[in-house]
Amino acid sequence: MVKNAVTCMVIALTALLCVSCSAGGDIRVVSIEQVSPGEANIVVRISNGDSADKTGYRVREGYIAFLHDDGTGIVGTAGAMEGASVLWSPRGVTYGTETYEYLTTDEGTTRFTRETSKPYELQRYEFPNEDVGALFVLQGQQTVDVLGTGGTLTSLANAGIFQNNGQCGSRIVSITDTKLAPPVAPAAFEAYSAQSDDGEVPENMAVVVQLTDHDGDVPPVLAVAPMIDGLTSGQNMFSCEADVVTMPSFQATYPNASRDNGLDANVGTMVLQRWDLSTGQRTIIPVVDAEGGAIELNEERTIHLYEGIQVGDEYRFISANGDAFAVDVTSGQGRYLFSIPSRSRDHSTVFQVTETGVYALEDRGDDRVVTLFYRPWDGEEQRELFTTSDLGRYLKGKALTGQLDIQSFALRPGWDGGAQ
């Protein structure tokens, strides 16, 4: 459904905002109508999350901050979104709240109204035609809102839960199973029967489905394979070349681990799931180091919810826990690179990656001082790019909002200041 866009121009204020940004003073807050990137290179999304919902009385609140290389900048009142992501593409900066989708450029901010409220965001994707897809989860379904280049906002619901999501060209695809997504089970079992010769049908199937460009609320099945006990991942991105999806995954050593038997469910090894969408087939490739040994994973070293990028044949990524790896997507040759641990138990460090290295935005927690670090993939020591206490007043929140958190951040396209 096409939605009317309300364009908020900021021509009269642009010069004033740029002076404020370059003066090196405190970060100041303005309305969303007054926000534009200016000369900033980092954009930060701040919001309160589920802690604001548990009491039922707290006010939802959120901000969008545009920061310069020295940590100065401007903050706009952008509203709340749990799991809020932000995407900076050549088209501009896109982000959202439960009710609205925003596009901020140097010309101003445009607001689009959602068809239905979206309380929890998973990820944003830029398509080859510069459309932007935002993925949400709510009550047993995942919805994609697509912001078209023609000024439209359309929504497509997908029945089921899809625990691994990513982009493959102009499509958003997900790797799930028939237990979590029962609506796709009939098509999944039919597809498996058509490609299998043994006549045996597994109880549960692993399935790749397409969440965009389809009719109805049941996503079409692209590939199927028997579900493997203890094989998990939990990602919102993966490698995709042509029609081949490759996703680093965790294979549990003890798939039957439980409190009763005392086995550790967090102990396992890294493998690659490779799904060829042109044939509908899956291949599992063990990830090994230079000596042929398995890349071991555990509670302290994880791959869950990584930020990744492909450089040549190598997929480089850092998990939400701060553990960095590099894996050849064809051979499975892998290496552990380094870890960037968070110094706060209550506030996570968030990451972005480029071909050269990792950017880590750390909220220190106790005083809400924020630091941007950069560390190259090649193992050099990380270095500090800036530290600012000016975001603290927004992160600390108010009595009716509780504390807020940095949900995500993004870099201006082409900017790689940490590598300079």
Where are these regions (language model features)?
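N-terminal "mature head" segments of proteins
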Residues: 2-146, 413-420
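Repeated scaffold domains used in trafficking and secretory/extracellular systems
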Residues: 26-34, 77-92, 117-132, 156-177, ...
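Hydrophilic extracytoplasmic domains
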Residues: 36-42, 49-67, 91-92, 103-106, ...
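Residue position within the beta-strands of beta-propeller blades
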Residues: 44, 95-96, 135-137, 173-175, ...
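Short loop/turn segments that connect beta-strands within the blades of beta-propeller domains
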Residues: 60, 89, 96-99, 105-108, ...
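Short coil/turn linkers that define WD40 beta-propeller blade boundaries
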Residues: 72, 108-110, 150-152, 214-217, ...
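Fungal eukaryote-biased detector of long internal structured cores
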Residues: 141-147, 156, 180-182, 217
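Acidic, serine/threonine- and glycine-rich low-complexity intrinsically disordered segments
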Residues: 164-346
